[in-house]
């Protein structure tokens, strides 16, 4: 009897495969090696992402204007002949400005790829925090149907929230908006 009990305990599935890890399971050491992203770190990364996108937009805008200017500078144009009824220099100036605006709009795509490359280690946690933050905004956001000129809705998408202090102020502004919209209806 005793030997049967020992054998049954030795040859159980758990005892046989306790040293093995299956592909469907994960180890606890991989999750413990990466520290969790705090809200303060998330807001710092969000601010860094916005700054990189803005700087990239400025540089690509200047680059787009320069490329448009260099292209239009090589075209031979009769200065006295109007283009679609407008002065040619005005059309060329408008084209340079349009090239700069298109370059500025391309900038955030380049900036976001730069941000992803520089913060590759924290990117997954940043995106998880970002979805959690946006879901919190969606829950706490007031109904915009009652906005007016005297009572505008506060930062609907939360684009100006870069710290916990800003988030708390946004919540206060949302509560003030709700209170004003209920009182004056």
Curated annotation (Swiss-Prot):
Cystine connections: none
GO BP, sorted A to Z: protein import into mitochondrial matrix
Superkingdom per UniProt: Eukaryota
Entry keyword annotation includes Transport: yes
GO (cellular component) term, any one: plasma membrane
One Pfam family recorded for the sequence: Pam17
Membrane-protein topology: Multi-pass membrane protein
Subcellular location: Mitochondrion inner membrane
Keywords, sorted A to Z: Membrane, Mitochondrion, Mitochondrion inner membrane, Protein transport, Transit peptide, Translocation, Transmembrane, Transmembrane helix, Transport
Transit peptide endpoints, chain numbering: 1-52
Ranges that cross the membrane: 55-75, 90-110
InterPro entries: Pam17 (IPR013875)
Task of the protein: Component of the PAM complex, a complex required for the translocation of transit peptide-containing proteins from the inner membrane into the mitochondrial matrix in an ATP-dependent manner.
Record-stated family: Belongs to the PAM17 family.
Subunit structure: Component of the PAM complex, at least composed of mtHsp70 (SSC1), MGE1, TIM44, PAM16, PAM17 and PAM18.
Full protein name: Presequence translocated-associated motor subunit PAM17, mitochondrial
The organism of origin for this protein: Candida albicans (strain SC5314 / ATCC MYA-2876) (Yeast)
């Amino acid at each position: 009897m005793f030997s049967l009990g020992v054998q049954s305990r030795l040859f159980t599935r758990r005892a046989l495969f306790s040293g093995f890890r299956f592909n469907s399971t994960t180890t606890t050491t991989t999750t413990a090696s990466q520290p969790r992203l705090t809200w303060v770190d998330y807001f710092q990364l969000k601010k860094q992402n916005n700054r990189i996108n803005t700087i990239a937009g400025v540089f690509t805008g200047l680059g787009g204007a320069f490329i448009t200017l260099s292209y239009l500078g090589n075209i031979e144009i009769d200065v006295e002949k109007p283009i679609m009824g407008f002065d040619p220099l005005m059309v060329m100036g408008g084209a340079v400005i349009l090239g700069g605006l298109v370059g500025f709009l391309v900038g955030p795509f380049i900036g976001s790829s730069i941000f992803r490359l520089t913060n590759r280690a924290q990117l997954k946690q940043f995106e998880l925090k970002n979805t959690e933050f946006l879901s919190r905004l969606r829950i706490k956001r007031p109904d915009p149907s009652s906005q007016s000129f005297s009572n505008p809705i506060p930062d609907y998408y939360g684009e100006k929230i870069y710290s916990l202090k800003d988030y708390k102020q946004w919540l206060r502004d949302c509560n003030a908006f709700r209170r004003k919209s209920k009182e004056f209806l």
